[in-house]
């Protein structure tokens, strides 16, 4: 069994803003660096968005309107917890990897945000490679892009 990867950051905004910014994934996700469109077509995706509810979908839209399913929302508890079954444009696997994001108040203007990705075994023979790839990618995505979006 492969260990989960966990990243913890502190963002300069309140808990509600931290959660809402994360949920507005299209406003901060660097589609020119990490997307199914870049991997498959060599183009920047048009958008990525999520339906904000349990069972909602996280979908990337390409420049020509093709949709890639990134995952399915499991938990959508505003200001506290967001989780999704995640496979980012790969053919859906069941079970998928799991991304959980927890939001904890530090004070009125700061929030601790912890992102954990687990269940690597869902990727079968590619599990170790996927874990290694995402381990590096979350630094750019979460620690840089998301944190910068929270700072405004």
Residue ranges: model-predicted function:
Residues 118-152:
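A conserved amphipathic terminal alpha-helix motif
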Residues 11-13, 52, 75:
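Conserved strand-loop elements at the edges of beta-sheets that form or border functional pockets
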Residues 49, 59-110, 118:
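Hydrophobic-ligand binding "helix-grip"
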Residues 38-41, 46, 147-152:
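Short, highly charged C-terminal tails/helix-capping segments
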Residues 18-22, 58, 73, 84, ...:
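Hydrophobic pocket/interface hotspot
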Residues 1-44:
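Hydrophobic ligand-binding cavity/cleft-lining segments
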């Amino acid at each position: 069994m492969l260990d989960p990867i966990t990243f913890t950051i502190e963002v300069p905004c309140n808990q509600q803003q931290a959660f809402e910014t994360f949920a507005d994934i299209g406003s901060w996700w660097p589609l020119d660096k990490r997307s199914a469109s870049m991997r498959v077509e060599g183009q920047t995706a048009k958008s990525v968005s999520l339906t904000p509810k349990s069972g909602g979908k996280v979908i990337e839209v390409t420049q020509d309107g093709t949709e890639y399913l990134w995952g399915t929302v499991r938990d959508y508890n505003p200001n506290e917890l967001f989780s999704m079954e995640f496979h980012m444009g790969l053919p859906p696997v069941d079970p998928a990897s799991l991304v959980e994001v927890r939001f904890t108040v530090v004070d009125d203007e700061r929030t601790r945000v912890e992102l954990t990705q687990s269940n690597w075994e869902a990727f079968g023979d590619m599990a170790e490679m996927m874990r290694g790839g995402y381990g590096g990618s979350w630094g750019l995505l979460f620690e840089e892009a998301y944190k910068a979006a929270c700072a405004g």
